[in-house]
Design a protein with these regions (language model features):
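N-terminal alpha/beta PP-like core and its mobile active-site loop of ThDP/TPP-dependent enzymes
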Residues: 1-266, 296
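Active-site diphosphate/adenylate-binding microenvironment
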Residues: 5-9, 13-18, 23-26, 270-330
């Protein structure tokens, strides 16, 4: 006989889950939710028949889980249905754009006999932006107004960035990235996309002359904190905001449709040339640390930027470095 835990592991392996780790905290789950990272979060609980006694460590796990896993929270009710629950949770986690799916696993469901591994469940296939949306945005671009494309989420990967760079080369739109992208591919040979500044005063300057802002898997920018006498919403009052593609849609297909609509499909994208900032000298400063990273980093480096204000110059200093991935705060 196979118990619930054994059948669960077989289901996870068959679904392509390759990394499992034990974790007692929740802060990274908050980051995963904000970053739209596909995570299956399995939380142990008391045996189903023990819950009614309200033991010392009993808690309402579903309520706590919804804070970081609003799209999918489920408590497994039996060993026989556990693996189907798990397969559906994995599909939910993988649904575009990605989310934390929480499966609560009571002890007796885990140790009970009769577990049956389940086949993987395919997540829904994302759809591109509809024709009416694409045509409305194409018309806005053709108007000649100062236009910026604000990119976020999964749009900051090479295929979508190249598509956006074609649009920029053809139509003169400005490319901007959200302040703290989950992951952005950068470096020589890729389009350079300027990140929106962390400080609201600087972000406001970047957006000052923008008359039309097109959102690509991104939200309209707001300040990180409220300040007396200053606006929280950073988009200029006279700027029109258009959403090309929402996080749960097909980003690349939507950008390609827009390029077709404005005639940018064959445009040659502008790419970042290779350039190192030079080896820093003198007294150690945050800027010189950023410069050293840009000078010495090898190809395919993964930068995990937790410097916040100390890393303000990091994007500039690494722009022409060999190709790399940058992961930021979410």
């Amino acid at each position: 006989m196979t118990n619930g835990a054994q059948a669960l592991m077989k289901t996870l392996v068959d679904a392509g889950v390759e990394v499992c780790f034990s974790n007692p905290g929740t802060s990274e789950m908050h980051n995963a939710r904000k970053g739209k990272v596909p995570v299956l979060n399995i939380v142990g609980d008391h045996a189903t028949y023990h819950v009614k006694y309200d033991a010392q460590l009993q808690s309402d796990i579903e309520t706590v889980a919804r804070n970081v896993s609003p799209g999918f929270v489920r408590t497994a009710k039996s060993t026989e249905t556990l693996c189907q629950d798990a397969a559906e949770a994995i599909a939910a986690a993988r649904s575009a754009p990605g989310q934390v799916a929480t499966l609560i696993l009571p002890a007796d469901v885990s140790w009970g006999e009769g577990g049956v591994p389940s086949a993987p469940v395919a997540p829904p296939t994302p759809e591109p932006a509809d024709d009416a949306t694409v045509e409305a945005i194409a018309k806005a671009i053709r108007s000649g107004k100062k236009t910026a494309l604000l990119m976020g989420g999964h749009s900051l990967r090479e295929p979508s960035m190249l598509a956006a760079a074609k649009l920029a080369a053809h139509s003169g739109v400005t490319l901007l990235a959200e302040t703290f992208p989950t992951r952005i591919q950068r470096g020589a040979g890729l389009p350079y996309i300027e990140r929106l500044a962390y400080l609201a005063e600087l972000a406001t300057v970047q957006l000052t002359d923008v008359e039309q802002l097109i959102l690509v898997d991104a939200k309209a920018p707001v300040s990180f904190f409220a300040y007396p006498g200053k606006k929280s919403y950073l988009v200029p009052d006279t700027c029109q905001v258009h959403t090309l593609v929402a996080p749960d849609q097909d980003i690349l297909a939507s950008l390609n449709k827009l390029n077709d609509a404005v005639g940018a499909s064959q445009a040659k994208p502008k790419l970042q040339p290779a350039k190192r900032p030079g080896r820093p000298r003198g007294k150690l400063t945050a800027e010189k640390v950023c410069k050293a990273v840009g000078e010495l980093m090898p190809e395919n480096t993964i930068i995990v930027d937790e410097g916040i204000t100390s890393s303000l110059m990091l994007s500039v200093m690494t722009a022409g470095a060999p190709r790399h991935d940058m992961i930021t705060l979410t």
